[in-house]
Amino acid sequence: MKRVMLTAVLLLASAALWAQTTLKNGMAALEEKYGVRFVYDASLPLEGRVESVTGTDLEECLEQLFAGRDIRYEIKGNHVVLRKVRKVTLSGHVMDASSGETLIGAGVFSGNIGAVTNSYGFYSLTVPEGDIELSVSYIGYGRKTLKLRLEKDWTQDVALIPDARIRAAEVTGWKDTGIGATSLGALEIPQSVIRRAPMLLGEADVLKSLQLLPGVQSGSSGSSGLYVRGGGPDENLILMDGIPMYNGEHLLGLFSVFAPDAVKKVTLYKSSFPARYGGRTSSIVDVRMNDGNAEGIHGSVTVGLLTEKAHVEGPIGPNTTFSLTGRVLHTGLVELVGRPLGLPANYFFYDVHAKVSHSFGPRDRVFADYYRGKDYFRTDSQEYVFDHHYDENYAAYDRYTDTRSQFRLRWGNTVAGLRWNHVFGGRLFSNTTLSWSGYRSNMLTMGEENVDDDGYRTLARNEFQYFTTIGDATPRTDFEFTPSPAQTIRFGAGVTRHVFIPDGMSLSLREEAGGKIVRDTLLQRSEGTYMPGWEASAYLEDEISLGRVSLNPGLHFALFSASGKNYPSFQPRLSARWTVTDSWTLKAGYSRMAQYVHRLPFARVNLPTDIWVPVTDRIPPQESDQWSTGVYYTGIPGWSLSAEVYYKDLRNILEFRNNRLVFSGADQWEKTIATGIGRAYGAEWLVEKTAGNLTGWLSYTLSRSERRIPDGSINDGRWFPYVNDRRHKISVYGDYSLNDRIDFSATWQFASGDRMTLPTRHSFTMGEDGLQEQLYIPSRNNWTVPPTHRLDVSVNFRKKKARGERVWNVGVYNVYAARNPDFMIYNENRRWTYTLPDGTTQSSLDQEEIPEGRIYAIKRSVFSVLPSVSYTRTF
């Protein structure tokens, strides 16, 4: 017994000794125990202590002794040769095995070292030389594992095989968006949601899908406009493959310009903006387009109630691919569908997106993008009147009057870009872009009157045209440097030449009498006010992982020069993530943004004729400071929960002054605009089910957005609600796969009403012409519109074919026919007096519950129950 106890004491003492020894003492102990000698260079770092060594043989002891150190050992007879581990860089692209399309945000791991592919599917991983096991995963794809022996820097492309059985909505580990990202407020909406979520008339829509996310409000029902965290629709930077677009809507806002078949990935940033983004104050919508299938010709054709779409992609030779997508509106069905919507019969829109990519090898790729979209509508009216007239001698004659009017409105975007990707040695990735983004709208009104007085003909015709044009030319270079798996440094710079022509117009008048021209005058003609501007930007951000803590500090610098004045802007950014446990994560962030362009409404509602203008020597850039924090939980398999709060300060916001609610020309607009401050704050909750046959989410947003004009020109200098200040918003999305042939999806949305300015009564003021009556408005945006809510459902019937599949989509928009306030009008509550058959008189008010003479709002609903059906054939 004593012998056993003595042995135990010696073993414990030995263990304690090992636990407290230094690395060199541990090496000396192994030399004594196993009769070996260590051979190494004097510069080899052998400092530090050994936690514990409990191996039963020399090999196991050496593994434990040098674990976690950049030291490699080799046993040669009685010698153990030590040398410093050399690091090598493994880089390449992750792609879809069936199409060759690069995958954005794929996770690449070797042990506890990981990376994520960037916007071009590129990854860079620095690992110790020798044998490694590489694991690559991506949502909706089978995981792939490779065993590699690395003795030098190496390029390894990885192709993943799609797996329809994998329905998880997240990838464990490293991500650019969601819980795994350092920044908060970055959300990626899956392609399955974009293509399967029920939408108006069955048209899958990128921007409307974003409206299902917390913190994102819509405009009127059916609109694809975005109001993010208390901001306006012009405060969202919409990027198509990194190129800004000024108008993202078709059909007066009912559809977005992005055809889902051409889209690879959509990411929304609403806070903690990475330093590489700038130019808007509320959100960044980064839309990445397909590169093209490298394995064969594939595509799809879709016929719906309103549009026809076609998409085709494939290889052009061994290293070149293309992607081509087109969409047109059914003009024949617009009258049937558009009449109850108040749309003109003669309406047409189209868009086309083309992309070609070429690989010169593992280090160089070139991409060419082109997009063009246009909307056009025209209304014509004609009226004939026949009546009898008498001349000064009381002689009768016949008069024929032919009155005609015409209205045309055209608008559209043109975007083109050329990009070059280059890899410098595996750790440094660059992307150089030359791009053009243009937008133009044109409005024409014409009135004509032809009069025939017994053969004597006269004509009077007037014509008014108005156009606005924007053109941006931009060279830009971005770099991504990965010195280690725990650090990614991004930096870059660009210059944009802006040209704004907001007010081109012409006004002409022509008169004829008896076949002779009496007057043919161009009353006014202007090629528009030429408003150029230069915008330069540069940025630096450093994403660092320090164990459970990740940081992304950055700085974005911008300089805008216009109207002889320079506006520099230093915009610090900081994001932090703390992984408290495997289930709980905390995040916080701060970002400053600046915006140098503004959209001014041409009328009282948003139209494609709205005017974009740059900052001037009188109107400074709009700025915002946003603080946000959030908590995230993933402890329940297949579920994730998150809660975020934010506060945003706004400076130099623009509001039309009282009684000046419309644009009045580029030379006058500064006089109708007041600048002020704003604030927006709120909380957002999101519950996601991310795995299984049933997936989806529930989100709730509680928010407030206000404005104030300190000079008192609006609302006497008091705070007033922003026009899209909606207190509550609830979104529910669900997707259920019954089997591989049938799937269902449904959305239910509720939102508090937005704000409008409503006169409350008539008042009288003394003017130059005496007592004058006018409407009295107590405050700006003083009335809350009724809330909106609706349920949309959709079902897909799929059938595999020898090549591709057939899909029938049947949906219903606004299932229970909610009478939502699609637009509002106001009226005066009048008393009407009428006589009954018995001779007595009675009177009544339009609205008995409202005092006589009071102004009240009337709700008008456009979208009732709308069924839809579409047919898609893929090949």
Predicted feature descriptions by range:
Residues F66-A67, V116, F122, G140-G142, ...:
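Periplasmic N-terminal accessory/gating domains of Gram-negative outer-membrane beta-barrel systems
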Residues E383, D387, D582-W627, Y647-E670, ...:
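Surface-exposed extracellular loop regions of Gram-negative outer-membrane beta-barrel proteins
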Residues R741, F750-L771, P786-R790, F797-F875:
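C-terminal beta-signal and adjacent terminal beta-strands/loops
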